[in-house]
Curated annotation (Swiss-Prot):
<keyword id="KW-0540">Nuclease</keyword>
<keyword id="KW-0131">Cell cycle</keyword>
<keyword id="KW-0347">Helicase</keyword>
<feature type="region of interest" description="C-terminal dsRNA-binding fold">
    <location>
        <begin position="1263"/>
        <end position="1355"/>
    </location>
</feature>
<dbReference type="Pfam" id="PF22389">
    <property type="entry name" value="Dcr1-like_dsRNA-bd_dom"/>
</dbReference>
<feature type="binding site">
    <location>
        <begin position="32"/>
        <end position="39"/>
    </location>
    <ligand>
        <name>ATP</name>
    </ligand>
</feature>
<dbReference type="GO" id="GO:0003690">
    <property type="term" value="F:double-stranded DNA binding"/>
</dbReference>
<dbReference type="InterPro" id="IPR036389">
    <property type="entry name" value="RNase_III_sf"/>
</dbReference>
<dbReference type="GO" id="GO:0005829">
    <property type="term" value="C:cytosol"/>
</dbReference>
<dbReference type="GO" id="GO:0003725">
    <property type="term" value="F:double-stranded RNA binding"/>
</dbReference>
<dbReference type="Pfam" id="PF03368">
    <property type="entry name" value="Dicer_dimer"/>
</dbReference>
<dbReference type="GO" id="GO:0007059">
    <property type="term" value="P:chromosome segregation"/>
</dbReference>
<dbReference type="GO" id="GO:0000791">
    <property type="term" value="C:euchromatin"/>
</dbReference>
<feature type="domain" description="RNase III 2">
    <location>
        <begin position="1083"/>
        <end position="1233"/>
    </location>
</feature>
<feature type="domain" description="RNase III 1">
    <location>
        <begin position="916"/>
        <end position="1038"/>
    </location>
</feature>
<dbReference type="InterPro" id="IPR006935">
    <property type="entry name" value="Helicase/UvrB_N"/>
</dbReference>
<dbReference type="InterPro" id="IPR014001">
    <property type="entry name" value="Helicase_ATP-bd"/>
</dbReference>
């Protein structure tokens, strides 16, 4: 393949061709001014490697390699990738940002296969190499854009040192070629000439390259420097007045972390630009924090108190100020005085007015230092609506150090495009546009803020590329000195580069060996090539600590402790949090503290790799992520419940095995109990089987006509003798009754081991089969229909035919048309007329739910002359029974499948319960596995929790969750079901009466009407069968039976069949042995409260140790593992109660009821009732505040319990209280030898404290209801506000008096300047809840304080804070 024709026709200039000839043959560092075509040369080199790769692949000489274009800014990824795509037919990949955190091995493996070139940020590429997803051997070219950044620990330097030079050292051993290196820069260094020589030499060593400098003389014929001049402005700075919005906010909100940076930003803008600019910052930040709040709430995240405070206070300040100074049309017009607008801004404005007075074709870039400056300058020009000026800001995407101004990558790209096309002609940019970004050629470049380095100066000046362009620098007298220093350094740089151009001065330099800034200690993972260094090890340890189980009150991080060492040397020991249970590691000595810490971190990472806690790609084993991956996999496999697979149905052995010479048989009598009128009298049937029949209870049938029918099977224990004559008679009877009930002809394909016959109602001797069978009726089956001779022939149970050839069009006699025709007729024209109702061809008695609600077709009633009618020698009662037969056989078959299922897996459950467990909703019966699946799921969670708790006793909580998830996940249950061939027992096929056919028969009318041997099942349905089967055994036979089926199915629990066998895997006496020397003084109080005495007191102590206590000496464990198991135990106790309490509740309803009892708020309240919060061992001041806050709210709202019995359900509760309760329940469970009986106190405690879950009513959001109600009344002057009250308190000690400042949040609802409802608390959420409860009380009482009529439809102005009057407890912020 020749790709040369694809390259856009860009002829290289002479200097470019010279560079290309060199760079195509050797590693090269190119130093050339901005805009001279460095990127074009890089693309030419990529094209060369692409052509070589094509030839190599065609010859099958080497595996595929790719080219890498490295950049140091994300916008450059988009820019360079787009340019390469426009020039080459290569497949170009873009990689940037945080993709590395969750980068999968599969994705990165596909890079080589999918792309020819990748454009990637340097830091991310380093991680690709460090984690072994790519290697130097996979590359043929590495391009370093702006390579002058390769200093110190920069990613460029680390890539070369850690991977390129390491690969070069073993090049001869591994037999591979190194990639070509091409570095590009316009500003290699700042400072003295000697320093430049030294730095270039170091770069040559680092990049294994030769530097090539293109001097300005070589470029003189192609480029000209812009005209450079200065604009001097006054040094006078603006001091914000004391009554300004910025000063007031600075004084009042100085403690709010959220806006501390905003204060700095606004003040900086005010001082440098003017008061108007500072005001715009505040307006922007108010919108920002409100957007941040809404986003957090949309994601279900809780706002911190500081964030809530900042939002509410800022809104109050700025809203009032905005109402006074702003119109509805936008920002106020700035005043051109020395306060509102500084001299610097004024001179910029005058300059732009002069430039754009006559034309808008000039392109201008204004470089500023701060993002906020770019934002406000752009807004300033738009507010003034200057003619011919279309300004827009261009800033970076990352968070600012001083404010939350940012621009997404897409907006950056869009802004540049609009600047290129002329929609914008003034671009106000930060440093993001100085270097590398392809800003179009500009006529005017303005440095609004001074350059701090030569690089900044050269790069920004390089943006002025148009002919006759200008470069203006704004300076005051102090900045002029700085600029002169920059010019001097730039002069040295130009002189040095001129000397270096086309010279070999490097060869004469004596320089130290290549600078190495990375570690000498490294570890390479042989399987992946991932490389661990000391520098990477430190961040890896912090990442590992972030994966540990913790709550908001606990933070984990590695601890470095200095160890004794020789003078001038340092040595450190690193210790991970005790929750890891990993021993400390000591590093080798080093001459710097930083290097010594890296050595210790390196040794610890090696230990973690050996333990399997860091994987082969140097990624910490994050069980939270592994759980999420499992859930994602499960969701991907199960998300489409419409995805189904076909499985063979199990056919009962009783249906298939037919003895060759049958002499004995078994009999069941089929009765019904629906006898509402003659229409629903059913003739009893004899059900004869070749095999003994399992005991089956009665079952209910239902259809769209008539009442429900209860089928009773009376099985006779003794077998009966049968001969060939009687057997032949039964076969004929069976076929006739089936045809009679289905109204179609049947052909028997294979013999069946069951037969049907009408019961002899006059039989008194049940010892012989021939006595039970109504032989006379069977013989009548085969008689021809006889015409009606007389009206006396017509009876209520007579089945009539109009056409003797159409035996399935049957009618029932209903009466005569006129009573005068009750005498015999001698002539046809005088024959009486009979009213006849057409009988159904077939009936489905397995209709439930929506199918049973369908309106049946009305039975047609017609009149016939009796002489035209024929009598079928079968009673209408038998016809009714025949219509039942398909549904009876359908149900019996399902029960036989369930019986075989029980027999195969040796289960201890009833047949009807097993049948329910195997029946899905698709069968459309009056029962399915829904409830049993819920029941079994709860037991499986308990069993899996105990299993992983016992198998992994020293692992963190996340790992327990992960290992449990592997057992209880639907993916695992699906695999279990497939391995056990469980799908064949599924009962998911509904009875479709039109197409149903009994086993062994086929309808003569259609080949499609055969016995169904296949069924379609979804993956989720199959997984649910496992849990439903467990639930069936648990329901009928208890815990041991449930364990046995788990063992039979091999779901992953420990190999036990008896509940007491859990104790074989648990040593009560040695558990929590690390606490043997730690005292817990509250044991007796807790035992007295719960009424249980512990054998192992350490278990009880462990249940009350919060993770924050693990910083204490002698504490090496916490309650997290106990809380994990206690959660499952408590779930099971509650579900046991709910399942039996509400037998008609669906699984969804049961889940809601369970959530009411076991949610965090309910459990925290129970823990509070038991006073558990008083005994929690912790080291967190925040936890003390949370406990105090929670206790205050509970005690306050207990007084209003009659109005809202479930008040605690609305309070934001501390999770550690609920965790402690679950841990304590687990401690009792373990201490009692896994006995659920020991927890009998739990259920009464929950029911008495929480009440009945079914009585709770969701009242909706009260605030929303009130808002809507007042809006409907036409009121416009209402709303909510949050204020803060700081209460000072003192505490006397022996030495002095300590002052404390406590913050309280006040949430108020106001109407027309008056506070209607008010809530006060230490937490914003709880203050709002209190306010809502008082608002609800007013609404329920229909209080005039809330609901009075008003006339404010024409008044839109809201009251100020001064107008809102409280009760003296709340002060307005203003």
């Amino acid at each position: 393949m020749d790709i040369s024709s694809f390259l856009l026709p860009q002829l290289l200039r002479k200097y470019q061709q010279d560079v290309y000839n060199i760079a195509s043959k050797q590693n090269t560092l190119l130093v050339m001014r901005t805009g001279a075509g460095k990127t074009l040369l890089a693309v030419k080199l990529i094209k060369q490697k692409l052509e070589e790769q094509i030839l190599i692949q065609e010859s099958n000489l080497e595996h595929k390699k790719i080219s890498v274009f490295l950049v140091n800014k994300v916008p450059l990824v988009f820019q360079q990738a787009e340019y390469i795509r426009s020039q080459l037919p290569a497949k170009v990949g873009m990689f940037y940002g945080e993709l590395s955190i969750e980068m999968s091995e599969q994705l990165l493996t596909n890079i080589i296969l999918k792309y020819n070139v990748i454009v990637i940020t340097a830091d991310l590429f380093y991680l690709f190499l460090a984690r072994g997803f790519l290697s130097i051997n996979d590359l043929n070219l590495i391009i370093f854009d702006e390579c002058h950044h390769a200093i110190g620990n920069d990613a460029y330097a680390r890539i070369m040192n850690d991977f390129y030079h390491r690969a070069k050292a073993v090049l001869s051993k591994k037999h591979f070629t190194l990639p070509r290196i091409f570095g590009m820069t316009a500003s290699p260094f700042t400072g003295k000439k000697g320093n430049l020589y030294h730095r270039l030499y170091q770069w040559e060593q680092l990049f294994d390259s030769k530097a090539h400098v293109v001097s300005e003389n070589e470029l003189a014929d192609y480029f000209c420097l812009p005209e450079e001049s200065y604009v001097m402005y006054s040094n006078k700075l603006v001091v914000p007045p004391s009554d300004s919005i910025i000063k007031k906010c600075e004084e009042t909100l100085q403690g709010c972390k959220l806006i501390s940076r905003a204060v700095k930003t606004a003040l900086a803008e005010t001082i440098d630009m003017g008061l108007w600019f500072g005001e715009q910052v505040w307006l922007y930040l108010v919108d920002f924090v409100e957007t941040k709040r809404l986003k957090k709430k949309a994601l279900g995240k809780q706002l911190s108190d500081d964030e809530e405070l900042a939002i509410d206070r800022l809104k109050i300040f700025v809203e009032d100020w905005k109402n006074n100074k702003y119109s509805d049309n936008g920002p106020r017009i700035p005043v051109f005085d020395s306060t509102d607008v500084t001299d610097k801004v004024f001179k910029l404005l005058e300059l732009l007015k002069a430039t754009y007075r006559k034309s808008d074709s000039v392109r201008t870039v204004i470089f500023v230092e701060r993002k906020a400056t770019a934002f406000t300058l752009s807004l300033f020009m738009k507010t003034l609506n200057l003619p011919n000026i279309r300004a827009h800001s261009f800033i970076g995407h990352g968070p600012s150090d001083q404010g939350e101004f940012s621009m997404t990558f897409r907006r950056q790209k869009d802004t540049l495009h609009k600047f290129k096309t002329g929609k914008y002609n003034v671009l106000i940019a930060t440093a993001v546009a100085e270097e590398g970004i392809d800003v179009p050629s500009c006529n005017l470049v303005i440095r609004f803020n001074i350059c701090r380095t030569v690089t900044q100066y050269v790069q920004s000046r390089g943006r002025a590329r148009a002919m006759a362009s200008k470069f203006l620098i704004f300076l005051n007298t102090e900045e002029l000195l700085i600029h002169e220093r920059i010019l001097h350094e730039e002069k040295n740089l130009k002189f040095a580069l001129s000397e270096l151009s086309n010279s070999n001065i490097f060869d004469s330099l004596v320089c130290e060996e290549r600078e190495r800034v990375t570690d000498d200690i490294v570890y390479e993972v042989g399987e992946t090539g991932a490389l661990l260094t000391g520098l990477y090890a430190v961040s890896l340890l912090y990442n590992f600590c972030n994966t540990l189980s913790r709550d908001v009150y606990t933070r984990y991080y590695p601890t470095f402790t200095a160890q004794p060492c020789l003078s001038g040397w340092y040595c450190f020991e690193v210790e991970l949090p005790k929750a890891c249970k990993v021993p400390a590691a000591q590093g080798s000595p080093a001459k710097s503290i930083r290097k010594a810490k890296q050595n210790a971190a390196f040794i610890m990472c090696l230990d973690l790799i050996r333990m399997g806690l860091i994987d082969k790609h140097l990624k910490p084993l994050d069980f939270r992520r592994k759980i999420a991956d499992l859930e994602t996999l499960e969701e991907d496999e199960l998300k489409d419940e419409g995805y189904i697979e076909t499985y063979e149905r199990y056919v009962p052995k009783s249906w298939m095995k037919v003895p060759e010479d049958i002499t004995r048989c078994f009999v069941s009598l089929l009765y019904t109990d629906a006898n509402e009128g003659d229409n629903h009298i059913f003739h009893p049937l004899v059900f004869v089987q070749a095999h003994s029949f399992p005991k089956i209870d009665s079952f209910i049938l239902n259809s769209t006509v008539g009442p429900r029918v209860k089928i009773v099977l009376e099985t006779i224990e003794d077998s009966f003798k049968i001969d060939s004559h009687l057997l032949e008679l039964l076969k004929k009877s069976t076929r006739y009754l089936l045809q009679f009930g289905l109204s179609t002809s049947l052909e028997q394909q294979i013999p069946t081991p069951y037969w049907l016959a009408p019961l002899n109602l006059s039989c008194t001797d049940y010892r012989f089969l021939e006595n039970l069978i109504d032989v006379d009726t069977i013989q009548n089956f085969f008689k021809l229909p006889e015409p009606v001779q007389n009206v006396t022939d017509l009876q209520s149970d007579t089945v009539l035919l109009v056409n003797p050839q159409s035996i399935y069009e049957q009618y029932a006699f209903e009466g005569f048309v006129n009573s005068e025709f009750m005498i015999p007729a001698k002539k046809k024209d005088k024959a009486p007329s009979a009213l006849c109702k057409k009988l159904p061809l077939r009936l489905n008695y397995s209709l439930w739910g929506n199918r049973a609600k369908s309106i049946p077709k009305s039975q047609q009633v017609r009149s016939f002359y009796i002489n035209d009618l024929y009598i079928l020698p079968v009673s209408r009662h038998l016809k009714n029974s025949a219509l039942l037969i398909p549904s009876i056989l359908y149900h019996i078959e399902n029960l036989l499948v369930a019986s075989s299922f029980i027999e195969h897996f040796r289960l201890d459950c009833k047949i009807d319960t097993a049948c329910q467990a195997l029946t899905s909703a698709e069968s459309q019966l009056n029962f399915d596995y829904d409830r049993l699946e819920f029941y079994g799921d709860c037991f499986l969670k308990l069993g899996a929790s105990i299993t992983v708790f016992l198998k992994f006793p020293d692992t963190q909580e996340y790992q327990l969750h992960f290992n449990r998830k592997k057992i209880i996940s639907n993916c695992n249950l699906y695999k279990v079901a497939i391995d056990c061939e469980l799908p064949k027992y599924a009962l998911s096929t509904p009875l479709e009466i039109r197409h149903w056919c009994p086993y062994g028969f086929q309808k003569s009318t259609s080949d499609k009407c055969r016995y169904a041997v296949l069924q379609k099942l979804s993956v989720k349905r199959i997984a649910d069968m496992v849990e439903a089967s467990i639930g069936a055994c648990l329901l009928d036979s208890g815990l041991d039976s449930a364990l046995k089926i788990c063992k039979s199915l091999s779901v992953g629990l420990l190999d036990i069949s008896n509940w007491d066998e859990w104790n074989n895997y648990f040593d009560l006496n040695t558990y929590a042995d690390s606490l043997r020397n730690v005292q817990f003084p509250y044991s007796s109080y807790i035992e007295e409260t719960i009424g249980y005495s512990f054998k192992n007191k350490k278990l009880l102590h462990l249940a009350f140790i919060h993770p924050s206590m693990m910083s204490q000496q002698g504490i090496y464990e916490n309650y997290q593992q106990l809380e994990f198991l206690g959660d499952a135990v408590l779930d099971y106790i509650i579900v046991q109660y709910l399942y039996k309490k509400y037998p008609n509740a669906t699984s969804g309803e049961l889940t809601d009821y369970k959530s009411f009892y076991v949610c965090n708020k309910s459990l925290s309240y129970i823990g509070f009732v038991l006073n558990l919060h008083k005994y929690i061992q912790h080291e967190s001041a925040a936890m003390c505040d949370a406990i105090f806050e929670y206790q205050e709210l509970i005690e306050a709202f207990r007084e209003t319990a009659s109005e809202n019995p479930w008040f605690w359900f609305e309070i934001d509760s501390p999770k550690f209280i609920s965790d402690t309760l679950e841990a304590m329940i687990c401690a009792i469970f373990l201490d009692s030898g896994f006995s659920l009986q020991s927890l009998q106190f739990v259920l009464p405690l929950f029911l008495n404290s929480l009440g009945d879950a079914t009585h709770t009513k969701a009242k909706g959001d009260i605030e929303h209801k009130v808002y809507q109600l007042l809006k409907d009344q036409g009121c416009e002057d209402f709303g909510t506000k949050c204020v803060i009250e700081e209460v000072k308190s003192s505490h006397k000690t022996l030495l002095n008096t300590e002052l404390h400042l406590t913050k309280y949040y006040g949430f108020s609802f106001f109407r027309h300047g008056n506070i209607v409802a008010y809530g006060k608390s230490r937490k914003v959420a709880n203050a709002k809840y209190i306010m809502k409860q008082r608002l609800l009380k007013l609404l329920e009482d229909k209080s005039n304080l809330l609901l009075y009529s008003c006339n404010c439809k024409f008044s839109k102005k809201k009251p100020s804070d001064e107008q809102i009057k409280g009760d003296g407890k709340v002060k307005s912020l203003t």
